[in-house]
Curated annotation (Swiss-Prot):
It comes from Roseiflexus castenholzii (strain DSM 13941 / HLO8). One of its GO terms (biological process) is translation. One of its GO terms (molecular function) is rRNA binding. This protein binds to 23S rRNA in the presence of protein L20. The lineage of its organism: Bacteria, Bacillati, Chloroflexota, Chloroflexia, Chloroflexales. InterPro entries: bL21-like, bL21-like_sf, Ribosomal_bL21, Ribosomal_bL21_CS. Part of the 50S ribosomal subunit. Contacts protein L20. This is Large ribosomal subunit protein bL21. Pfam families: Ribosomal_L21p (PF00829).
Length: 120
């Protein structure tokens, strides 16, 4: 099972056990976080939210912080001997996806193929 989650404007496809690099969070390594904006739960019976899936959340553990690759910004003005070279390294938080939780009603719907009942 996988999920599409949105975190501060970015969308990520996550699965249980996956490690992921997201924008910097103010969280200590080893702490548990919750990604609550679940847009889609995929699998045999996908569940699409409008815009989010009610009661669904992704539980993750913070592994640590890291920096991304350097982006070089070079500015110059033609024929004027004006040259400026600067760089930027974006900071990220590495998280491990522990569990994809679906609410009780949605779990009931996802396990039943269309046309069948769950005996309840």
């Amino acid at each position: 099972m996988y999920a599409i989650v949105r975190d501060r404007g970015m969308q990520y496809r996550v699965e249980e056990g996956q490690t992921l690099r997201i924008a910097l969070l103010d969280a200590e390594p080893g702490s548990a976080i919750e990604l609550g904006e679940v847009l889609l739960i995929g699998g045999e019976m996908p569940l699409v939210g409008a815009p989010t899936v009610d009661g669904a959340k992704v539980l993750a553990t913070v592994l640590g912080e890291e920096k991304g690759d350097k982006i070089v910004v070079f500015r110059y003005k033609n024929k004027k001997r004006y040259r400026r070279r600067t760089g930027h390294r974006q900071e990220y938080t590495r998280v491990s996806i522990d569990k994809i939780v679906v609410g009780a009603n949605e779990q009931h719907v996802t396990n039943t193929p269309e046309g069948e009942t769950n005996g309840a």
